[in-house]
Amino acid sequence: MYRKYSDGIIEVITGPMYSGKSEELIKRIKILQFANIKTLIVKQKFDTRFSHNEIVSRSGTKLNTIVASNVEEIKKVWNNTYKAIAIDEVQFFDKDIINYIDELASKGIRVIISGLDTDFARKPFGIMPELLAIADDVLKLKAVCFSCKNAGTHTFRITNDKDQKLLGDTESYQARCRKCHLEGEEQKIQMDNLKLNLSL
């Protein structure tokens, strides 16, 4: 999806796990590269699931990136020859990234970011609500529900860990529709109650 803008723009690609966010981000980056628009590609350092310094889609497509854990590390490699920036797993950055992204777009830079909008409990994930609020364009992707094969709109955590930032893949997470997500949470509560009763 190539669109030429004379002014900056913030594009957000979001949705649950397994919905193809990284695939869509890679596709947009490749189109920019084809159009000779120099793009800084950034990956959050926290995400080490598939590769340390690459964005990797589930279809196996890869792109080399710089790795950063905060805005200052991005600023060290940014220069005025870049006309676009793409950031994967943006939800893991702190609030400083919000103003930085807004500033870049205000200077005419095309900003493309991807990340989870909600966590395993269907609650807003980190800084994503603020980023969605300042976005010019939002694409919300859907996965396939692990349980019923309908559209999967939420990320379900198989384990009982409550930490919002818990790195994992198929061993820890599933995509689920609203109904199956709620049923899964209820089943986990029932299992916890059963374990508690057995321990008494």
From Swiss-Prot:
EC number of the protein: 2.7.1.21
Keywords: ATP-binding, Cytoplasm, DNA synthesis, Kinase, Metal-binding, Nucleotide-binding, Transferase, Zinc
Residues at the catalytic site: E89 (proton acceptor)
Keyword Hydrolase found: no
Coiled-coil blocks: none
GO cellular component: cytoplasm
Protein name as it appears in the record: Thymidine kinase
Organism this protein belongs to: Mycoplasma mobile (strain ATCC 43663 / 163K / NCTC 11711)
